[in-house]
């Protein structure tokens, strides 16, 4: 009887200890939760453009979720496998040498394309984060693109992301990350737009605060070219949060088009384009994954979704990447207004060497 009583007391004590530990985490998260307001805020330029005005009518843009340098082909990610409690056999963060390898791959890509591309829209770029060993990635991207205007819209700011919860000694740590936008021309306006919708508590305290970065460039003919860098919500069962974010983006873009402006949206939508089968690259072999589509009536029919249906842009990170085995889909693309002509679109197949996403490049003509 005494042994049973001691065992029961031990279990109760452990449960109480776990409860106090979790309560402490949530109290800390609540007190330090960064909550940007709903109003658009000006983005501070961090680098100036060498060109003074936009004079060309033919422009090339690239969008790439660079995966904070931590999700190259060799890596998996515990959150996709074990969830918030423990890491299991998956990585919480990639080894530093892999982060450096991935960053160098991104920098080489930027350097190789800087003479032919006018706009680079990057997502999941770290300023300084534990997950990428506090390597100043955004600063490195600026140095790789001299002569490009640069600004940064924060969408992930947390002093300590405590997951996996049962491994406090190995927590994800501090994160400062977001959308890095680079342009050959100086924007007349750059603003961060907080997207509506949020995760339920307590996830909300440690998740991204999704946003879009809008850039306005005076164009020939008295119009503006409006370029929007976006990254919509992931880990969103049923696309419930995205269903709130999408109308905001639609209204923002349509309002600019109604003024006669040229409008381009590009980024990681975390949804497939309308009517695009999410298992196109691995028919029937979904491995339990499900990727939703943007609604067919999301935009008027004369707007153009720009993507390359032959090249996947995203691979899942439950396991390290293996061609033909790892599930691939397409969730990174552009949307262009009817007064722009889409002249080329290319998915750039890198074998997911440097990120769990691949770049998409488009060329447009102002009509």
Please provide the spans of the model-predicted regions.
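N-terminal, active-site-proximal structural segment of metallo-dependent hydrolase catalytic domains
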Residues: 2-144, 152-167, 172-176
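Metal-dependent phosphoester-hydrolase catalytic domains
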Residues: 4-9, 13, 21-49, 216, ...
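Beta-strand-turn-beta hairpins that frame and shape the catalytic cleft
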Residues: 50-61, 73, 174-175, 179-193, ...
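Active-site beta-strand/loop signature of hydrolases that rely on acidic residues for catalysis
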Residues: 60-66, 89-92, 99-134, 182, ...
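Solvent-exposed loop/turn segments at secondary-structure junctions
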Residues: 66-69, 125-129, 156-160, 187-188, ...
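Short aromatic-enriched loop/helix-cap "lid" or pocket-rim segments at secondary-structure transitions
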Residues: 72-77, 133-135, 162-166, 192-194, ...
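Surface-exposed cleft-lining segments at the edges of enzyme active sites
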Residues: 89-96, 124-128, 195-204, 231-240
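Conserved S-adenosyl-L-methionine
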Residues: 122, 150-157, 190-196, 344-348
